């Protein structure tokens, strides 16, 4: 489970990250990253978007748990000012955690290359 300080909870944070952030698509997920300019941030924050297109409630919660686990694994690679939103695509319902983690790492690396960010 993601620690509370690393969870994105406000809709304004989600909206800003999705609309102003850099996007990278993978087969199972779309990742958005925005570098926050607030200096008092306790660390990177991660939010999930798992819509009904992914499946019924049981399938959506399963995907959410897997994505949270994958996000926890890459948390240490993120800058403290990073805001990351992970949008699950319908294919993610059949994905296993290692594949989701690899796709998340690949997407974040693509974003780093596009923005020229050091971490």
From Swiss-Prot:
Any single biological process term in GO: tRNA 5'-leader removal
Identify this protein by name: Ribonuclease P protein component
SS bond list: none
**GO CC, alphabetical:** ribonuclease P complex
The molecular function terms in GO held by this entry are: 3'-tRNA processing endoribonuclease activity; ribonuclease P activity; tRNA binding
Q: Which UniProt keywords apply?
A: Endonuclease, Hydrolase, Nuclease, RNA-binding, tRNA processing
Q: Does the keyword RNA-binding apply?
A: yes
Q: Which top EC class is named for this enzyme in its record?
A: hydrolase
Renumbered residue ranges of the record's region Disordered: 1-20
The UniProt entry's sequence similarity note says:
Belongs to the RnpA family.
Extract the Gene3D superfamilies matched here. 3.30.230.10
Which purpose does this protein serve, as stated in its record? RNaseP catalyzes the removal of the 5'-leader sequence from pre-tRNA to produce the mature 5'-terminus. It can also cleave other RNA substrates such as 4.5S RNA. The protein component plays an auxiliary but essential role in vivo by binding to the 5'-leader sequence and broadening the substrate specificity of the ribozyme.
């Amino acid at each position: 489970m993601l620690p509370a300080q690393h969870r994105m909870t406000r809709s304004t944070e989600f909206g800003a990250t999705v609309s102003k952030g850099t996007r990278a698509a993978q087969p199972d997920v779309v990742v958005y990253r925005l570098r926050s300019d607030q200096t008092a941030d306790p660390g990177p924050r991660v939010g999930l978007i798992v819509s009904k297109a992914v499946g019924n409630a049981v399938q959506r919660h399963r995907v959410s748990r897997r994505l949270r686990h994958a996000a926890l694994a890459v948390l240490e690679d993120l800058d403290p000012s990073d805001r990351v939103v992970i949008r699950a695509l319908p294919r993610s319902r059949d994905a296993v955690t290692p594949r989701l983690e690899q796709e998340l790492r690949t997407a974040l690396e693509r974003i780093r290359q596009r923005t020229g960010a050091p971490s």
